[in-house]
């Protein structure tokens, strides 16, 4: 495919040791990790009654999305969006399996409502009044690369900015042996095609017909662990590349499938 050039206009972030992009950027540059005592973010864009019922994955996604749109200068109502969770809401999956396996099979209507994979996209579009296209993706370990490809192809084809949100919460206790993630993580990007960018595009993506491998983590121990066990935390490799600025021509590769990979190139200014 022809390379797609783009810029990142805004970034939002929330995780176990950071509450925004500047704090995450400091961790990527070598500062030490300090774990949160908070249970999770409380995104003000969600009305209070709905926020109390919103599960952790939804609150992670909406908080990061709101930060990114505010930083970008774009109105949330004008942005098509793609949300991705590699694991889904394992707490609700665990709950529903236990209830349905028991004698009383009456599920909580609220929990059932929140169990769908596009719950975060629904909370976001309703809270912001967004009527643009909203999609929800799942790709387990390859969630980041698949979502970047889908969202950036859409942004390029429609020539419009896009919101991309990556989020995963800790795995439920019963699933931790299989899904070892123990950290909350959410990052949101507002990406802009090169033709619409107010400044020169600083990144490009292309698909290669050969296998790829994830970049080696080289940050603090806790961030490295998150990168290894939380599927959507693999976006940290893109953020680390972006944080280098446009003075270099470095690149990273991400697996798409057994035979293909996504290459992200840092463009020189």
Language-model features, listed with the residues they occupy:
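Conserved "HGTGT" condensation-loop signature of ketosynthase/thiolase-family condensing enzymes
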Residues: 1-117, 121-133, 166-269
């Amino acid at each position: 495919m022809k390379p797609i050039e783009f810029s990142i206009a805004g970034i939002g972030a929330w995780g176990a040791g950071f509450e925004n992009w500047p704090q995450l950027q400091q961790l990527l540059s070598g500062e030490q990790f300090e774990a949160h005592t908070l249970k999770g973010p409380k995104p003000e864009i969600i009305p209070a009654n709905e926020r109390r019922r919103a599960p952790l994955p939804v609150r992670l996604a909406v908080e990061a999305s709101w930060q990114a749109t505010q930083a970008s200068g774009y109105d949330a109502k004008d942005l098509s969006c793609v949300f991705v969770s590699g694991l889904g809401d394992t707490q609700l999956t665990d709950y529903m399996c236990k209830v349905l396996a028991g004698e009383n099979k009456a599920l909580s209507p609220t929990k059932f409502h929140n169990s769908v994979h596009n719950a975060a996209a629904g909370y976001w579009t309703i809270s912001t009044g967004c009527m643009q296209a909203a999609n929800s993706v799942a790709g387990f370990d390859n969630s980041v690369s698949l979502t970047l490809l889908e969202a950036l192809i859409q942004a390029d084809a429609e020539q419009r900015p896009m919101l991309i949100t990556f989020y995963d919460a800790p795995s439920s206790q019963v699933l931790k042996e299989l899904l070892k993630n123990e950290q909350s993580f959410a990052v949101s990007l507002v990406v802009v095609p090169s033709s619409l960018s107010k400044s020169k595009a600083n990144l490009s993506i292309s698909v290669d017909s050969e296998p790829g491998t994830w970049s080696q983590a080289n940050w603090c121990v806790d961030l490295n662990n998150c990168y290894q066990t939380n599927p959507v935390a693999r976006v940290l490799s893109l953020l680390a590349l972006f944080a280098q600025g446009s003075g270099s021509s470095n690149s990273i590769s991400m697996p798409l499938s057994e035979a293909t990979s996504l290459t992200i190139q840092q463009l020189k200014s």
